[in-house]
A protein has these predicted regions:
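Conserved ATP-binding N-box helix of the HATPase_c
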Residues: 218
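Alpha-helix capping at helix-to-loop junctions
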Residues: 7, 21-24, 59, 63
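A gly/ser-rich beta-alpha-beta helix-loop segment of oxidoreductase catalytic cores
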Residues: 1-20
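Nucleotide and nucleotide-moiety/phosphate-recognizing core
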Residues: 15-35
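Phosphate/pyrophosphate- and phosphate-bearing ligand-binding catalytic cores of soluble enzymes
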Residues: 29-205, 221, 225-237
Length: 237
């Protein structure tokens, strides 16, 4: 719940009811309603503070054996959900197996023998921007990569009339493909552009340098600033 994790159209906020906290300043343990955590995209009011430790959570889950509505395009496609099936659901066990398969394919399930999984998961959050910024980015993409690429740019509705862009898509269009840089101790995953990985000998400095290079390159190209998803300790970008 600290950063309201989620994937494929569902996040912890959808099922979280309460969180048990240990207040470090008072030593008090208490249960707090999820509504009091200000949950939003990859955020809660616990994220950038060390005042409390999460000891436990309570979830409200379904008991009918079915998944949440399959609204995320990639997952819906592999489960053969058509665009006409509004609020379609499938067996939860089937959906879970498919999600794990997709995550493994992207190097997001840890495997000690696969350096593409040596990461903190998605490193940058997808930027939430105004419609005007979306149009600017689309114009830049058209100049750099052509009209077809600009028309296919991923863009999703967010709260307050804003839009959510794909950080991975922007990173690749800014010139940083999967596996970048080819000989670096810290590289973008060869399976998923958003993961910054340790190839076996990377230091904190190597990771920070790569993160800064990617962030600065995207901002220079598109005027969009990418924010890191993991909380940093003792270092900043």
């Amino acid at each position: 719940p600290v950063q309201n994790v989620g994937a494929y159209g569902v996040e912890i906020a959808d099922v979280l009811t309460e969180v048990e906290l240990y207040r470090r300043d008072t030593g008090v343990r208490e249960w707090v309603r999820s509504a009091d955590l200000e949950l939003s995209y990859r955020y809660s009011n616990l994220k950038f503070t060390n005042k409390a430790v999460v000891l436990g959570i309570r979830l409200r889950l379904r008991n009918d054996g079915l998944s949440a509505p399959l609204r995320f395009g990639e997952l819906a496609r592999v489960l053969n959900v058509s665009v006409n099936e509004i609020e379609a659901r499938r067996l939860a066990t089937t959906v879970r197996a498919e999600v794990l398969r997709l995550r493994k394919k992207k190097g997001m399930v840890y495997n000690p023998d696969d350096h593409d999984t040596w990461s903190a998961g998605s490193f940058f959050t997808n930027p939430i921007v105004s419609p005007e910024v979306v149009q600017h980015v689309r114009t830049v993409v058209e100049k750099l990569h052509g009209a077809d690429d600009a028309a296919a740019m991923p863009c999703f509705d967010a709260s307050g009339g804003r839009k959510k862009l794909s950080a991975a898509w922007l990173i690749e269009r800014a010139g940083y493909p999967k596996g970048y840089p080819e000989d670096g101790p810290a590289r973008l995953s060869t399976k998923h552009t958003l993961a910054l990985t340790n190839r076996g000998s990377a230091t904190t400095e190597d990771l920070v340098e790569l993160a800064r290079t990617v962030r600065n390159g995207v901002e220079k190209t598109f005027g969009v600033s990418l924010a890191p998803e993991p909380v940093w300790v003792g270092v900043s970008l």
